[in-house]
């Protein structure tokens, strides 16, 4: 998993509230267990018209936001079913950070397991970030995970909270397997000690 330290770039504003996982990636695209190739289907029903052409009104189809790695989202982002394909699609598109006032719990946890930092902010801070993002290519956000800050294009900074375990894993690029391998010496020592306790 790619490490997450500092991320700087244009943020795409998606003001829609209650975007569920079926809108993030519709069920018809869930026939694969591969994490790659799903980016083209991200927000498919919003990104594309019925004839398959791009919807020019959708934010990620607009020139300033095509390569956005940060998504500023409306309330309750990632609600609905627990499909892990939703963060897979975001990551495959290139999104590394999503910011909202609230996320569905399972989606929130799945993001961290797939290298995406999900940040919860206050409604007031979210509105400021929306305003910054809506300035387009002339305004960038900088997300610093170590410092737990988001710096806006005018230099203003806001602080966010993050679980220490989640922070450690993202900073070091550790998924659950990587975290286990990081502790393999402790696991080996425990197993050796257990083997000596034949009565256990």
Curated annotation (Swiss-Prot):
Catalytic reactions of this protein: (2R,3S)-3-isopropylmalate = (2S)-2-isopropylmalate
Name of a matching Pfam family: Aconitase_C
Matching Gene3D superfamilies: Aconitase, domain 4
GO biological process, one term: L-leucine biosynthetic process
Keyword presence, Lyase: yes
Domain of life, source organism: Bacteria
Pathway per the UniProt entry: Amino-acid biosynthesis; L-leucine biosynthesis; L-leucine from 3-methyl-2-oxobutanoate: step 2/4
Complex formation: Heterodimer of LeuC and LeuD.
Protein name: 3-isopropylmalate dehydratase small subunit
Organism: Methylobacterium radiotolerans (strain ATCC 27329 / DSM 1819 / JCM 2831 / NBRC 15690 / NCIMB 10815 / 0-1)
């Amino acid at each position: 998993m790619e490490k997450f330290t500092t991320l700087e770039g244009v943020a795409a504003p998606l003001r829609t509230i209650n975007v569920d996982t079926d809108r993030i990636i519709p069920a018809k695209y869930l026939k694969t267990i591969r994490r790659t190739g799903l980016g083209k289907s991200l927000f498919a029903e919003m990104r594309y018209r019925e004839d398959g052409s791009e919807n020019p009104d959708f934010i990620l189809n607009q020139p300033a936001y095509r390569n956005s790695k940060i998504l500023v989202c409306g309330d309750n982002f990632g609600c609905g079913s627990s499909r892990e394909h939703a963060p897979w699609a975001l990551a495959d598109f290139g999104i590394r950070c999503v910011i909202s006032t609230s996320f569905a719990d399972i989606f929130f946890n799945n993001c961290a397991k797939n290298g995406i930092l999900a940040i919860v902010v206050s409604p007031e801070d979210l509105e400021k970030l929306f305003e910054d993002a809506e300035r387009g290519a002339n305004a960038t956000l900088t997300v610093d995970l170590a410092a737990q800050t988001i710096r806006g294009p005018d230099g203003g900074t806001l602080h966010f909270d993050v679980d220490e375990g989640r922070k450690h894993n993202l900073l070091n690029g550790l998924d659950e397997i990587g975290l286990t391998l990081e502790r393999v010496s402790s696991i080996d020592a425990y197993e050796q000690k257990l083997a000596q306790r034949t009565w256990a």
